[in-house]
Amino acid sequence: MSYVLTETSAGYALLKASDKKIYKSSSLIMDLDSSEKVLKEFKIAAFSKFNSAANALEEASAIIEGKVSPQLEKLLDEIKKEKKATLIVSETKLANAINKLGLNFNVVSDAVTLDIYRAVKEYLPDLLPGMSDSDLSKMSLGLAHSIGRHKLKFSADKVDVMIIQAIALLDDLDKEVNTYSMRCKEWYGWHFPELAKIVTDSVAYARLILTMGVRSKAAETDMSEILPEEIEERVKAAAEVSMGTEITDVDLINIRALADQIVEFAAYREQLSNYLSSRMKAIAPNLTQLVGELVGARLIAHAGSLISLAKSPASTIQILGAEKALFRALKTKHDTPKYGLLYHASLVGQASGRNKGKIARVLAAKAAVALRYDALAEDRDDSGDIGLEVRAKVENRLSQIEGRDLRTTPKVVREAKKVEMTEARAYNADADTAAAADSDDEDEETEEKADKKRKRDTEEEEEEEETESKKSKKEKKEKKEKKDKKEKKEKKEKKDKKEKKEKKEKKEKKSKK
C-alpha cells in the first residue's frame, strides 16, 4: 500500500493511494489532472492537527531542517504495522530522517513524487473534510508570517549587520561632505577667493561662513573658537584686500544653508564613527586591537559577516578587497597583488615599500587567529588581550625586517596559573657509587659517538664530491651534444645552399641555349 505524507498549515495529513505503485506511473500528470481523479485516487487515512500557531511554527521549522518531530513520529506509527507499505515524501532530508527511525516501510522521495504533490496541493481542500479553501489560505498566510518573523528575529549572528551598515554609511557621508565642501568653496570663492587657501579644513571653512557671513564683517568677527590666532589674523588681513565680487543677501542665505548642511554632516559622521568604534570593540575586540576599527569593519563588510570572515584562510584575508587586480593578474599571468584592504592598516603603513607585502602576509595570518577567537570562542574575553599579543608579534617582525625599533604595543601580563606545591623527594646518597662506577663507560660511549660522527661527516663529503663530479660530467656531455647539433645544422645549411646554387646555374645554362 502507498501513502502520501502531506504537510499543511493545519496539520499532517496521511493520504492512502488506491494504486500501490502510483509513484512508478508513466502517465501520472494525465491521471491526476482533475479534482474527481485526485479524489478517486487518494483517501485520507490519518490526520494530526496542530494545536496552535506556535505548534505549527515548531513543526514547520522541523520539516525545513529535515527533522522528525514527536508528533510526526506518532502519526507514522499508525502505518508501520502494514506489510510492504510505501511512504511518499516531498523533502529528501525528511525522507532520510524517517529512514533512520527504522520503521517497517519503504520511503520514496524523487523527482516523480513532485507531480503527485503538485496535484495533492492543488486539490487539498477537497481531500480534507471540514476544511475550506479560505480557511487553508488564512492558516498558510499566518504560518508564513510566523516563519518570516522566526527567521528574521534578533540573534548574535546578525549583530555584525550593524557594523556593515555603519561602515557603508560612513563612506557615503565622507563622499557627501567632500562633494558639498567643494561646492561651497567654489560658491563662496566668488566673494572671498583667498579664504580657501588659508583655511584648508572643510568643516572649519563652513563654520567660518556661518559665523562671519560676508567678508566685510571679518574684522569685527571673533574666530577664536574656529581658527588658531595666526590663521585668524591672516583671514582678517586677506578680507581687507580681497579681489572677490560682492554677493546679495539671498546668495548668502543659500551659501549658509549649504555650510550648515556640511557642519551637520560632519557632526553626525563623528557620532557614527564613535558608534562604529564601540560596536567593533564589542563584536571583534581582538581584530580591532590588531588592525583598527575602520579596517576591521571594512573586512567584515567585504566578507559579508564575521563568521564568514573567520572561516576564510589568511591568504584570502590578505588580498580581500583586491579581487579585480587578482583576477587580472591571473588572466595576464602577472604577479598577484600582495595586499587588499589590509594596506590601510597602520602596521602595513609603517613598513617601507619593499617590505609592505611581507608585513601584510604576517598581519593577515595574525588577523585570522584574532578573528577565529572573536567569532568562535566559547568563553570569550572582550579585553582584546589576544589582539594586543599578536600585534606585538607583528611589530617585532616589522622591527626585524626594517632594522629599527617600531614596537609601540605594551606587553600583556596575564595571571599565572596556580601550581600545586608538592614536597621534593629526598636525596639518595646510595646512588653516588653507581654514578662513579659508570663514569668510564660513559667516556667510552662519548668516544664511540665522536668516531661515528667523524665517519658520517667524511661520507657526506665524499657523496657531495661525487654529485659535483656527476654534475660537471653531465654539463660537459650536454655542451658537446649542443655543439654537435649546431655543426650538423651548419653542414646541412651549406649543403642546401650548394644544391640551390647548382640548380640555379643549370637553369641559367638551359635558358642561354
From Swiss-Prot:
One CC-aspect GO term: small-subunit processome
GO molecular function: snoRNA binding; snRNA binding
Major place of residence: nucleus
BP term (GO), one: snoRNA guided rRNA 2'-O-methylation
Segments of skewed composition (Acidic residues): 438-448
Source domain of life: Eukaryota
Keywords from the UniProt entry: Nucleus, Ribonucleoprotein, Ribosome biogenesis, rRNA processing
Annotated spans, Disordered: 424-513
Residue ranges, compositional bias (Basic residues): 471-513
InterPro entries on file: Nop56/Nop58 (IPR045056), NOP58/56_N (IPR012974), Nop_C (IPR042239), Nop_dom (IPR002687), Nop_dom_sf (IPR036070), NOSIC (IPR012976)
The Nop domain, residue ranges: 283-403
Keyword flag Nucleus: yes
SMART domains, alphabetized: NOSIC
Subcellular location: Nucleus, Nucleolus
Reported function: Required for pre-18S rRNA processing. May bind microtubules.
Family in the record: Belongs to the NOP5/NOP56 family.
Name under which the protein is recorded: Nucleolar protein 58
Organism: Candida glabrata (strain ATCC 2001 / BCRC 20586 / JCM 3761 / NBRC 0622 / NRRL Y-65 / CBS 138)
Upper lineage: Eukaryota, Fungi, Dikarya, Ascomycota, Saccharomycotina
